[in-house]
Amino acid sequence: MRQRVGRSIARAKFINTALLGRKRPVMERVVDIAHVDSSKAIQPLMKELETDTTEARYKVLQSVLEIYDDEKNIEPALTKEFHKMYLDVAFEISLPPQMTALDASQPWMLYWIANSLKVMDRDWLSDDTKRKIVDKLFTISPSGGPFGGGPGQLSHLASTYAAINALSLCDNIDGCWDRIDRKGIYQWLISLKEPNGGFKTCLEVGEVDTRGIYCALSIATLLNILTEELTEGVLNYLKNCQNYEGGFGSCPHVDEAHGGYTFCATASLAILRSMDQINVEKLLEWSSARQLQEERGFCGRSNKLVDGCYSFWVGGSAAILEAFGYGQCFNKHALRDYILYCCQEKEQPGLRDKPGAHSDFYHTNYCLLGLAVAESSYSCTPNDSPHNIKCTPDRLIGSSKLTDVNPVYGLPIENVRKIIHYFKSNLSSPS
């Protein structure tokens, strides 16, 4: 009996330390109710639990509420020209040594920066910059794809997704789209295909999850190489990634719901035109619950902190659901407040995660996409392709006069339609 008890205690300690990642025990604080408003229905005695997460949220919340209080009489506005300066400089200078870790994310940086410029103003991506992007990408992959994170690096689904997105923003300048090796990319996608319906992100060492599926389907749609061979088993894989919360995890049956994975799954279902194959009501509930009432922005998982990037990862998922007729599930005005008040800083250009954080290219792009979603309404014809999603300004919400974006692809609507139309006019077989 003592041995069993001992094993149970040891197992509990292991779970608490190794699996739950407790760095210190949960603290209990007794609240003195003598100073509490007796008119409110409260238990005679309550204990408030403290964790690293609750302490971190308290600090963020104090910063956010202070900003809202200080700026309450000021109409929020996007400081476009300030952010443009930050983005333009990236194409003119060598990036500092502390950004060496992004060496394997070169296509991503091109997409984040170029997309941010185009979302703020469709004319802000100059022809000279487009040519620089094209030259860089075809230096990474002289054959025209698939693309790695940099020259000499392994081809990767995420890098190829970012590269195709970046090329779509270049408006086929100098005929650059004809340099894309659609046949080579198609054969590579087939080689990444797994029996369970997923895709490895990299042929040699890649993982398999919902991100890989979304990247593969987005690439294939934009290049007009989507086939039944590519989509076989994908729907079943995605359905099994929706968990009891309503959102989607990375893999079937094993993960908690996460904003990034949920976006990848939702956008993939839109591309497959199979949104009705999942529990949409639970997905709407989960998406709505990610918006924090006090902060007004989104978090990515239950009991996590607000983060500007989820303005698109969760907000974009909600916009896709809205487009397909499932209604609006979050407060767009509140999200707009969070982005404009809390993700901008007067002294530093670019957009950021939350107050106290530094701006970066990643958060600049996804905060801007989230802002575009918050200021728009979405619709589409039943059974229509997701690239035909319609976007109209929401007249009840202020406008930053951003470019209309397609929430499925994270790109301006006109660029999505332009590249898809171009390759649909090119009737050559990808296989």
Swiss-Prot record:
Pfam families: Prenyltrans. Changing residue 310 to K: Impairs isoprenyl transferase activity. InterPro entries: FTB, PGGT1B-like, Prenyltrans, Terpenoid_cyclase/PrenylTrfase. Optimum pH is 7.8. It catalyses: L-cysteinyl-[protein] + (2E,6E)-farnesyl diphosphate = S-(2E,6E)-farnesyl-L-cysteinyl-[protein] + diphosphate. The keyword Transcription regulation does not apply. (2E,6E)-farnesyl diphosphate binds at residues 258-261, 301-304, 310-313. It is found in: Cytoplasm. GO terms for cellular component: protein farnesyltransferase complex. Changing residue 209 to N: In ram1-1; causes a defect in a-factor production. Zn(2+) binds at residues 307, 309, 363. Its EC number is 2.5.1.58. Binds 1 zinc ion per subunit. GO terms for biological process: protein farnesylation. Signal peptide: none annotated. Keywords: Cytoplasm, Metal-binding, Prenyltransferase, Repeat, Transferase, Zinc. Present with 3910 molecules/cell in log phase SD medium. Belongs to the protein prenyltransferase subunit beta family. This is Protein farnesyltransferase subunit beta.
